[in-house]
Amino acid sequence: MPLKPEIQEFLKLRAAANLPEVFQVPISVFRAGTQNHPILAAKLPDIYLVEHKNIPGPTADLPIRIYRSTNETNTPGLVFFHGGGWTTNFLDTYEYALRNIANLGKLTVVAVQYQKAPEHPFPVPFDDCFATLEWVFKNCSKLGINPNQIGVGGDS
């Protein structure tokens, strides 16, 4: 099956621009590019509550965000780990999506800003995520989350 014409045109323009491959760019340059994402300028969906906290991690305190769609207790929960190959992206990039997930799913979402490689090599980012999951389980009652209805998700 041939590619759609708009995809062919995009690939042609990208090739003509002679852009470096992701692995050829310093990580600081690549990260800076993710901080200019158009979604950061979008109007954010209304939500009942967004709470910013720091929780203890294995090697450092970890910033988390808690998105509550309602003031009800005993709601389902989702612990969300953002994509980026353990090296890029940050919570602000996901603000729009996480508000929507919480609202549409009628649940509480907890997302973590885990430490990134190469400054913090694997398994540090994974350990940060796992510590966040453990923290959520230990704090279900404070978070208003039903401990029998916790999911784990993310993107890559």
Stretches with model-predicted labels:
Residues 64, 79, 101, 122-156:
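Short strand-loop-helix active-site module centered on a catalytic nucleophile
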